[in-house]
Amino acid sequence: MEKWVIAAKRADFNQIGQQFHIDPVIARLIRNRDVIGEDKIREYLSGTVQELPSPWLMKDMEKAVDILEKKISQKAKVRIIGDYDIDGVTSTYILMKGLARIGADVDTYIPDRVADGYGIHAHLIERAETDRIDTIVTCDNGIAAAAEIQMAKDKGMTVIITDHHEVPYREEKGERQMVLPPADAILNPKQYDCPYPNKNLCGAVVAFKYIAALYERFGVPAEELEDYYELAAIATVGDVMDLQGENRILVKEGLCRLKNTKNQGLQELIRANSLEDAKITAYHIGFVLGPCINASGRLDTAARSLALLNAKTKEEAARLAGDLTALNQSRKALTEKGKEEAIRIIEATELKNDRVLVVYLPDCHESLAGIIAGRIREKYHRPAFVLTGGETSAKGSGRSIESYSMYEELVKCADLMIQFGGHPMAAGLSIEEKNIEEFRRRLNVNCMLTDEELRPKIVIDVPMPVSYITKELVEQISLLEPFGKGNTKPVFAQKNLRVLDHSIIGKNKNVVKLKLLDPQGISVEGIYFGEAEDFVNFIREKDSISVTYYPEINRFRGRESLQIIIQNYC
């Protein structure tokens, strides 16, 4: 059973509203997102990319720029080694375009998820040696590849790491000591001694910062960086970074530019998903466009997504966009099948009693493990790992809840795994099949999650009568966009709403349209998306219902009306 709680953060909402010309409700929503103080509120409402931190603040940036300046003058061969997810593909594209612009002799390699696995492996170093590569630049990987970086160094190569994943560490006398690979330069804001203020950048933004510094060194006009904002936005949302501070400003700017993008591949991907007339939001990146870019790395090769971004003609872009959209449809079907199998296993075994779920799906495509883990996490509100079978070992991904740092818990089980890495909220690993049961046992023995932490919470921003909703308020709520992790869509709530009328609509009969009446006699239209039959059965048994909701303006055939989107009910 969900626990509904009201955010009780205090401030003078009327004073903030007067100062910034916003409704006090909007001031309260901003405070609930921990935006405090005049400067932070101004940045939140109207911050621009011109105010973002200098790339030169990042540890090793000067060194990394010096290295490539020298290598370019020597006409040395540079290879970018990326990753097969949305962040890795966009990072690779940003570095490739940026380095080519300043005259580098550059090529790219994105590892194949199945054939190569994540990140740098020994055979990629050997291939680089065969191809007479002088310098390797990683993106969205490398921070945990100490042995492979050492191998490249032993072969005389220069290595620059650009990454954003957690830095490996070891415990010494109660303190964490970073275990860094022996690269010539490491750009990763998560290094303990890196002064860059935003530690929550995605890999593509780290790559973007590197290109920004290189452009400055090489005298490239700063306006040329503007084409990368939309890619930074796609990666930030697609890799589920917190939409706060710098990240939110970048995404806001990128979304504005995406509508009129000059990139033919993105134009055609937008068209293939029937979004050419839509206002593109973070939702469309996270749930429509982003999954298409990810789909090639999951079910085929991420080279297709990179080719889409590189497409030189409308025809090529349209073909690739169509292919990726079709692949994503296949991915959806396979994901649903895997999710249902995982739930069946959990419900039929003692797994259902675990606080940390570890589900082994030997026949599932390994690329779907993370998505399925996320669905399992949502259903059970517990940290979830999904492992799949491989040729020599099992591979898997985990998705966590706020109270459980997944990467730190994996460190405690490091001896059981072949390889692992990740963040507090997500992780990836490979493990011998014989160790899976012990892995599950140890994670649960170590788990300190309480019953309260395992109970889903619905945090209500403002208990607000529907009679307070106006068109002006709804328009002001849009000032808070883009919404996503770390800047969630506001949640309002009202008790004692009477249902005057309802009907199930939609092609899949999963939408309920309602007419509601509040205690003051004000009526409002409502929409509920989800398990329609369950919702209808619930309201039939009740004289009134309590709901959490989000208000919006319904525009239909030239008419506008206020309605609420019902999110939860009781």
Locations of the language-model features?
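Catalytic domains of riboflavin
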Residues: 1-3, 479
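Hydrophobic helix-and-loop "lid/oligomerization" segment in the mid-to-C-terminal part
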Residues: 6-135, 155-156, 173-176, 182, ...
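Mid-to-C-terminal polyanion-binding domains and interfaces
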Residues: 70-74, 316-360, 412-570
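Residues at the C-termini of beta-strands that transition into short coil/loop
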Residues: 112, 188-190, 388, 570
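Active-site cavity-forming subdomains of large catalytic enzyme subunits
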Residues: 126-204, 208-217, 227, 244
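A short acidic, amphipathic alpha-helical/loop segment
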Residues: 147-151, 357, 372, 476
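Histidine-centered active-site/metal-ligand motif
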Residues: 164-165, 365, 423, 511
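Short, well-ordered strand-loop elements centered on a beta-strand within folded domains, enriched
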Residues: 177-178, 184-185, 392-400, 523-526, ...
